[in-house]
UniProtKB/Swiss-Prot annotation:
GO terms for cellular component: extracellular region; fungal-type cell wall. Aerial growth, conidiation, and dispersal of filamentous fungi in the environment rely upon a capability of their secreting small amphipathic proteins called hydrophobins (HPBs) with low sequence identity. Class I can self-assemble into an outermost layer of rodlet bundles on aerial cell surfaces, conferring cellular hydrophobicity that supports fungal growth, development and dispersal; whereas Class II form highly ordered films at water-air interfaces through intermolecular interactions but contribute nothing to the rodlet structure. It comes from Aspergillus fumigatus (strain ATCC MYA-4609 / CBS 101355 / FGSC A1100 / Af293) (Neosartorya fumigata). The keyword Signal applies. Self-assembles to form functional amyloid fibrils called rodlets. Self-assembly into fibrillar rodlets occurs spontaneously at hydrophobic:hydrophilic interfaces and the rodlets further associate laterally to form amphipathic monolayers. The gene is rodC. Residues 1-22 form the signal peptide. This is Class I hydrophobin C.
Amino acid sequence: MLVTMRLSRSIAVFTLVTYATGLPSLQVIPRGEPQLPLLDPSMTIKEAARKCGDKAQLSCCNRVVKAGDYTSVDEGIGAGLLSNLAGGGSGISSILAFDQCSRLDAQVPVVLLPIQDLLNQHCKQNVACCQKNPGDASSSGVGVSLPCIALGSVA
């Protein structure tokens, strides 16, 4: 009975540790940090809005959560075997989730002075292209709804 209890406890601890180490890391990118990929500092709001296209809205987001983006180095016999089975492994790519976004208007009031309407003057945080009508993936078993994409990631 005592041996069975110790074995069960050992299996539970081992499973918990394996699961916890296989999870992707979550990192919140604070406001002052540079956004990745970096944008051209001379880009105007009109150019950025054109890059987003007609189905997306240019937005300025205060908060970005970055998940994943790490590479694991496995050593020894069987190292990394369980993390690969649990969905981990080497070269997991990152996903940026944008939050607290506000719309950036491309319409600029007409001023007598010729001023550049630079994007970096209107948004010091993270610039993203957000869907005008966010999708709903709740009815689909495989569907994923990504309402915002970093402007630097748009081709």
